[in-house]
Amino acid sequence: MAQAVDASKNLPSDPRNREVVFPAGRDPQWGNLETPVNASPLVKWFINNLPAYRPGLTPFRRGLEVGMAHGYFLFGPFAKLGPLRDAANANLAGLLGAIGLVVLFTLALSLYANSNPPTALASVTVPNPPDAFQSKEGWNNFASAFLIGGIGGAVVAYFLTSNLALIQGLVG
């Protein structure tokens, strides 16, 4: 086995000797690397379809979508894994915990918006960053929509979890 590895070092046609990591755009001054993962069409498609990078969305719509997702998935760990998981009102505790964390995230976003953040740079994965995050107003719109969406997502998760028996009875 060691012989095969040693012998492959001298064969340029061996796939193990091909470079797969390059500087982005073949320019080492960018300070970014183009790998088979971040340069693949599937990863580029996925990243560019996330709400933060999808073209044509306003900052408010971006914040609403991101907030709904965060509020929805933050509810579960607070309700089902928190210290009140065995209590009768575990779902309410999960709702309040998720809303509290969304409020803290919104405060952090507002602080970041008021710190004059740098403009987004083009990268291998996102060659055209959106204009939504170029101004303080865009970031503040994103933060306020994040709060609304986050609370809404947590309330939807609370409603679905609290009324699971009713929903199962309606569906089947």
Curated annotation (Swiss-Prot):
Gene Ontology CC: photosystem I reaction center; plasma membrane-derived thylakoid membrane
Membrane protein topology class: Multi-pass membrane protein
Major localisation: membrane
BP GO terms, sorted: photosynthesis
One protein family per Pfam: PsaL
Record key words, sorted: Membrane, Photosynthesis, Photosystem I, Thylakoid, Transmembrane, Transmembrane helix
Source taxon at top rank: Bacteria
Quaternary structure and interacting proteins, as annotated: The cyanobacterial PSI reaction center is composed of one copy each of PsaA,B,C,D,E,F,I,J,K,L,M and X, and forms dimeric and tetrameric complexes.
Protein's UniProt name: Photosystem I reaction center subunit XI
